[in-house]
Amino acid sequence: WMSEDLVGAGVEALTELADQIGKPDAIITDPFLTAAALAAERIGAPLVVSGWCATRELDEDALYYVQKVLARESIERMERLYERFGLTGVNFASGATPSILSPHLHLSYFNAEWYQADADNLLPQTLFVGGTPDQPADAPPAWLTQIPPDAPIALITFGTTFAGDIGWFAGAAQAAARAGLIPVVVIGWTTYSPEDKDALKAALPKTTRLLNWVSFPHILPRTRLIIHHGGMGTTHAALVYGVPQLIIPYAADQQGQARRAAQ
């Protein structure tokens, strides 16, 4: 999300689109789409950040060495992009890390209680809108209807980025089975070699359902436990459906989700 070539191309494309259809009333963006934040300033449109709180700037002294190195590299890249497009960076934090920070509005799909330990770092442009369970729009899949309605299910997923850890899936499924739960293991669309796929199947309990994807509205109402990586979307879904979570974080904001779930 900080590739100067790709970000620059994105800014140009969004600017051209605004020229064609007119300046939008606002640009609503993912918290990591640098091009959208730059383009919003360039065309003079307010930026709304979707799915991320507005927080105070990080203190460089609190960063690890490798974080400081990456932060300096990020600042240098952003300064070159500002100069290229004649911008000042109104939609970015000016501290140690140049994260996207709208002065107008950040929408969080959690609530203030979820961020109670971080309350002192939240900025007033954060609006908590919470969330509600979605109702299924279609019939449940056949594999799910074949599981008895009173059978306890453990949903096991590592999202889309970290889905290649075969040992993790096997260990979680074995633990769930020993606890009397039926493991539903969701591995995403990660490409496994035939050997790795066979090894995974051999390591799973015989009661396991192994899938690429599941519909949360169908499976979560029947789930007794979800074991996952702490991704924001998975964590949020488990919360709104009231499913107990066992979180094993890997990277990014996952440590924070695990900490908040424990609190």
Question: Which residues fall in each region the model found?
Answer:
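Nucleotide-sugar-dependent glycosyltransferase catalytic domains
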Residues: 1-153, 158-182, 195
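A donor-sugar binding/catalytic signature common to diverse glycosyltransferases
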Residues: 26-29, 211-260
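Residues in the short beta-alpha loop(s) of Rossmann-like NAD(P)-binding domains
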Residues: 53, 189-190, 251
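Short Asp/Glu-rich motifs
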Residues: 59-60, 195-196, 239, 257-258
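Short, hinge-like loop/turn segments at secondary-structure boundaries
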Residues: 65-68, 201-205, 246, 263
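Catalytic donor nucleotide-activated moiety binding site of glycosyltransferases and closely related
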Residues: 171-209
